[in-house]
Amino acid sequence: MIVQAISRALAGHHLSRAEMADVIGQIMDGGATPAQIGGFLIALRAKGESVDEIVGAASAMRSRATPLVCPRRERSIDTCGTGGDGAGTINISTLAALLIAACGGVVAKHGNRALSSRCGSADVLEALGITIDGEPETVTRAIDVAGIGFAFAPKFHAATRHAAGPRKELGTRTIFNLLGPLTNPAHVHHQVVGVYDRRWCEPVAAALGALGVRRAAVVHGAGGIDEIAVRGETHAAVWDGATVSSLTLTPQMFRCEEVDPAGLAGGDAAHNAGILRRVLAGRDVGPGERHEAVLHASAMTAALGLELLEPGELDLARLPDQLRRARAAATDGSARLVLHKWQEVSRAPVGVDLTVLTSRLAAVTAGELAGVE
């Protein structure tokens, strides 16, 4: 199948969803050689991947993933982005996920270690004391108790190992760079997705809709970042459950002042984790506008996610209110408490008495954690 698919792609012909699912299935089942995998990925990129091809590939990955049970799935959300923008920013989507969980969202965070940056979501969470490669039941328990859990992509998508070598040797973006946000093993109902190139906003939003996501917002910010920009415009494609619409977001729509995006510059896992800890402890991360840049970016992402979770029609006029909720979670200790519970649950052995653990964690208050980083 893959040999014929390479020929078709080289001739400029798109594959159907079913054909694409068959080819990706062949790759993931170990039925293709490294040369065939590399040739197919490059032929696809040269042609340009279609929405049907993206959906077919994601469907094949989803069907082979280790399933993840997500409590309260009707409130479930993920902030996993594509990465690969080369900007080296702080882990904004991870901080936003904590803010959403603190505001009552049910977060099943999908992610991996860094590919093009120095620190991916898995790296910073590990530095924050989260056990990132937990078994599915451990992740489910974390979602249930803390409101947030982490699905480590290599753990839940073991079959992608067959494409890892060719992807690394190619050293360029391929369709697999788009598939992370589309293959959350918890099958969340809502998503905020940052993409590395504006041209992917509408196709990824359409693909999410085709895969059964109820609501999603796909964003690409000024300066080429896969986040909502803290200065300038952000292009967004929104899937509302029926159609994809395009719009422009600005900090002013959230009632945020524009700040210097240089404040979003990140470092290695220890550096980024330190910044997240200080934000959640209500401490300044300076210098200059750094604190406001990190807080604005994460709170805007969280606000957009919280609006996706609202019943009824999406109302962008509510974004300032959602932003206030998200910022409050960062400053009143709520998100810090979520992180503490997550740390405890993720490290607890499988089989531990969940009733006792939950009761103990329920007794911890944000006030008791005040001043602790």
Question: Where are the language model's segments positioned?
Answer:
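Glycine-rich anion-binding loops and their surrounding alpha/beta cores
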Residues: 8, 14, 63-66, 89, ...
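N-terminal basic/disordered segments at the start of proteins
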Residues: 1-13, 79-82, 87, 371
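Active-site-proximal loop->helix
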Residues: 114-130
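Active-site cofactor/substrate anionic-group-binding motifs, chiefly glycine-
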Residues: 48-111
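N-terminal glycine-rich anion-binding loops that anchor highly charged ligand groups
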Residues: 1, 9-55, 63-70, 297, ...
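Short, conserved micro-motifs enriched in small and acidic residues
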Residues: 34, 87-94, 115, 292-297
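Acidic, glycine-rich active-site loops and adjacent beta-strand->loop/helix elements
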Residues: 81-86, 111-117, 156, 222-223
